[in-house]
């Protein structure tokens, strides 16, 4: 029998424990702080963030996922919310800020319900019901978009690019993105592999200089200046083997006593390299991309044959070259045949921003393309590349799913209206959670108004009134005019998948945090490289 009053120590002294409401409040606070961090970046008039790392490197962006990735975050609940943004980026390529802001608002509404003594399980059930209903309603709100509807696809890309630092050239960028995505669509499945669109970044020119190359651009130069700079009607060999004499695996030693033998040895080495080059030339190849090294002597012989050669090409670039030119990657020079060669109308070395780059262009049916992103400075071109990447993601979603919804907060207001109506049919305290979910969705139009310097209350009232009318589900906030307008007419549209993924991710993250009622945190080991006092996760750290 245990002694009365004697304390039983289960956890070590350096472990902190937060139980029940304390744990929930702490997690909710951490999640809300992450959401507040990116909230001001939402929409076309959202502000940018400047992030400076330990080395003094600067990133200027308003891309939600980039901000969250670059931030050093300690709190485990905050890290879970950052995962929401990463999932959104990976799945659909855009809507990261929307997902995180909705998650933060769901947590804020959940805290209000917890203060009314509503059990977390009830809130979770209500949120799950609301999420399922929202996704169902989204499908009924969505409009169809056909793959051949270029104008609509351009509008989708422009909506994504707006507010991302590349606005002045958004029409041109949208056109480039739509062309690029269309070029790599799999004709059988209708799917798009984003990896087949290479975004090459070079500063030193205005954003308007951004171009689509129907082929591949390699950030390399010719291995020998004697080689031709430009090859028309190129026959391209892709080699995954070095053009040099292979060293043996064994540590063999050759003792030469006669100087003539040494000359024979060197001549034999030369002959082996010359034979390799002869074999390549015999196939009719006049351009060689090699994943490994090219011997100095091999470079000389290739130049004499008028063959343009590039070495140490990345594996990903080799795969894109194969897709663009129709070439096959060969792992042994002896196996190279004319059938393995790819074709391109032009292969040329050009100077871009002072650096030599190899352009492989005029491919007949390229299944890999390159967007050469330009900007006046390194920070501008990085932001342009991020905008292009997001636009590729949304156009890909629209082509694959074929459904779009109105932007500018129109969809969120409509969902909130329908969820409030649905809440009336829900019995029990879950009804309050469904209503809270509906209110949380309105954070998107409210934030769009705030970030544009408009009165959020006035705008919400106008939006709700517009949505009560027949066909009002497409009315959203035009932040440039400060008016409530038809978003489809205005061309502010987003793929359905971006919205469903944002609502799914936000709900799952908030539900996961609400389920936690006990946090047991070990203190960091002293002398840890990030500082020894980081174990405390109390509210004072945030």
Swiss-Prot record:
Keywords from the UniProt entry: ATP-binding, Chaperone, Nucleotide-binding
Gene Ontology MF annotations: ATP binding; ATP hydrolysis activity; ATP-dependent protein folding chaperone; unfolded protein binding
Gene from which the chain derives: ths
PROSITE patterns assigned to the protein according to its UniProt record, in alphabetical order: TCP1_1, TCP1_2, TCP1_3
Primary role: Molecular chaperone; binds unfolded polypeptides in vitro, and has a weak ATPase activity.
Subunit and interaction comment: Forms an oligomeric complex of eight-membered rings.
Family: Belongs to the TCP-1 chaperonin family.
Nucleotide-binding is among the record's keywords: yes
GO biological process: one example: protein folding
Pfam families linked: Cpn60_TCP1 (PF00118)
InterPro entries in alphabetical order: Chaperone_TCP-1, Chaperonin_TCP-1_CS, Cpn60/GroEL/TCP-1, GroEL-like_apical_dom_sf, GROEL-like_equatorial_sf, TCP-1-like_intermed_sf, TCP-1_chaperonin, thermosome_alpha
Zinc-finger is among the record's keywords: no
Record's protein name: Thermosome subunit
């Amino acid at each position: 029998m245990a002694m009365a009053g004697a304390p039983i120590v289960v956890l070590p002294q350096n472990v902190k424990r937060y139980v029940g409401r304390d744990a929930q409040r702490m997690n909710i606070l951490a999640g809300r702080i992450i959401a507040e961090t990116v909230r001001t970046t939402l929409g076309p008039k959202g502000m940018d963030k400047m992030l400076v790392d330990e080395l003094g490197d600067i990133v200027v962006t308003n891309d939600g996922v980039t901000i969250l990735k670059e931030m050093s975050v300690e709190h485990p609940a905050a890290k879970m919310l950052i995962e929401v943004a990463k999932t959104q980026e990976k799945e659909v390529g855009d809507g990261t800020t929307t997902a995180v802001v909705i998650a933060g608002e769901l947590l804020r509404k959940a805290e209000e319900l917890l203060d009314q003594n509503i059990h977390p399980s009830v809130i979770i059930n209500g949120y799950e019901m609301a999420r399922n209903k929202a996704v169902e309603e989204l499908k009924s709100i969505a409009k169809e978009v056909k793959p051949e509807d270029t104008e609509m696809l351009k509008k989708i890309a422009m909506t994504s690019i707006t507010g991302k630092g590349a606005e002045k050239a958004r029409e041109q960028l949208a056109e480039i993105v739509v062309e690029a995505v269309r070029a790599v669509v799999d004709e059988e499945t209708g799917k798009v592999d984003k990896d087949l669109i290479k975004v090459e970044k070079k500063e030193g020119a205005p954003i308007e200089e951004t171009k689509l190359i129907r082929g591949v651009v390699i950030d390399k130069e010719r291995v020998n200046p004697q080689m031709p700079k430009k090859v028309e009607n190129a026959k391209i060999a892709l080699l995954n083997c070095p053009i040099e004499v292979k060293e043996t695996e064994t540590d063999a030693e050759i003792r030469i006593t006669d100087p003539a033998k040494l000359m024979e040895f060197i001549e034999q080495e030369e002959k082996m390299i010359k034979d390799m080059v002869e074999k390549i030339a015999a196939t009719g190849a006049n351009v060689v991309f090699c994943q490994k090294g090219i011997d100095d002597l091999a470079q000389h012989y290739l130049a004499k044959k008028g063959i343009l050669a590039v070495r140490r090409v990345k594996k990903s670039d080799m795969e894109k070259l194969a897709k663009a030119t129709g070439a096959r990657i060969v792992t042994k020079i002896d196996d190279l045949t004319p059938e393995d060669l790819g074709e391109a109308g032009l292969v040329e070395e050009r100077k871009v921003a002072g650096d030599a780059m190899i352009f492989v262009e005029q491919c007949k049916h390229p299944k890999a393309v390159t967007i050469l992103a330009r900007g006046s400075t390194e920070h501008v071109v990085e932001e342009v590349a991020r905008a292009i990447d997001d636009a590729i993601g949304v156009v890909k979603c629209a082509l694959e799913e074929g459904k779009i919804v109105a932007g500018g907060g129109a969809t969120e207001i409509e969902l909130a209206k329908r969820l409030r109506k649905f809440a009336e049919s829900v019995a029990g305290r879950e009804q309050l959670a469904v209503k809270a979910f509906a209110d949380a969705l309105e954070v998107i139009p409210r934030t769009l108004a705030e970030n544009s310097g408009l009165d959020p209350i006035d705008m919400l009232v106008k939006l709700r009134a517009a949505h009560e009318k027949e066909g009002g589900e497409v009315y959203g906030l035009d932040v440039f005019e400060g008016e409530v307008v038809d978003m489809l007419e205005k061309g502010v549209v987003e793929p359905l998948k971006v919205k469903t993924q944002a609502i799914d991710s936000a709900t799952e993250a908030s539900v996961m945090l609400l389920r936690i009622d006990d946090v047991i945190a070990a203190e960091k080991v002293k002398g840890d490289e990030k500082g020894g006092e980081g174990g405390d996760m109390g509210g004072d750290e945030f």
